[in-house]
Regions:
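Tryptophan-rich aromatic "cage" segments
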Residues: 158-181
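Polar, surface-exposed loop/tail segments
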Residues: 75, 79, 131-158
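Short helix/strand-capping connector loops at secondary-structure junctions
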Residues: 97-107, 148-159
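Substrate-gating cap/lid region and adjacent catalytic-acid/histidine neighborhood
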Residues: 1-113, 124, 131
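Non-catalytic, well-ordered alpha-helical segments in soluble enzyme domains
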Residues: 114-139
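Extracellular/periplasmic catalytic domains that process cell-envelope and extracellular macromolecules
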Residues: 66-67, 89, 119, 145-147
Length: 181
């Protein structure tokens, strides 16, 4: 898949296996979001969307509904230069940042901006562990997650709060993977 040999037909087949009736709309959404992306790039984005991102969103919604504790949502959008930039921000990519250990060549390639981001993210996790709130001077004010605005901290070269990121994909994936019954 990394070598770019995935065809549009194979992309469709693999997305259909997880998206069902939402396949056409999701493929269009990913094509629009990644116009220069190869089929392999769009497949990785789609599988990330279905296997990790939207399920995290659905879980956050359940916790918000319980009203027992504040919920905070984040997205790591920083793109690693490792492996010619093909690694992207993948599952568990946040761990080197949380532990302020970004010198690993296979994940962050020791990039200078990775070190800066690690200082911000590790300060954020420390603040959360100490106070129950991630707010600290290293990042913008981080509001709690709520269904009304879906405030999400985006960790990247420039950290920022985005409301309901990837709205269209969230709605499509929510319908495709939501539990029934």
């Amino acid at each position: 898949m990394w070598n770019g040999t995935l065809t549009e037909e194979e992309l469709r087949r693999r997305v259909a296996a997880v998206a069902g009736d939402q396949t056409d709309e999701l493929l269009t959404a990913y094509r629009n979001a990644m116009p220069q992306g190869r089929p392999a790039d769009r497949l990785i984005a789609a599988l990330t969307g279905s296997n990790f991102w939207v399920r995290t969103v659905l879980l956050a919604e359940r916790y918000v509904a319980r009203r027992r504790a504040p919920v905070y949502m984040y997205s790591l959008d920083w793109q690693s230069p490792a492996h010619d930039g093909r690694v992207r921000a993948h599952h568990a990519m946040d761990l080197p940042f949380v532990f302020d250990n970004t010198d690993m060549p296979d994940t962050t390639a020791g990039a200078p901006d990775a070190r800066e981001l690690a200082a911000r993210i590790s300060a954020t996790w420390i603040a959360f562990a100490r106070n129950g709130s991630p707010d600290n001077r290293a990042i913008p004010s981080w509001p709690t997650y709520a269904a009304a605005d879906r405030a999400t901290m985006v960790f990247d070269t420039h950290c920022r709060v985005v409301h309901d990121p990837d709205h269209e994909a969230r709605l499509l994936w929510s319908r495709a993977v939501a539990p029934t019954g």
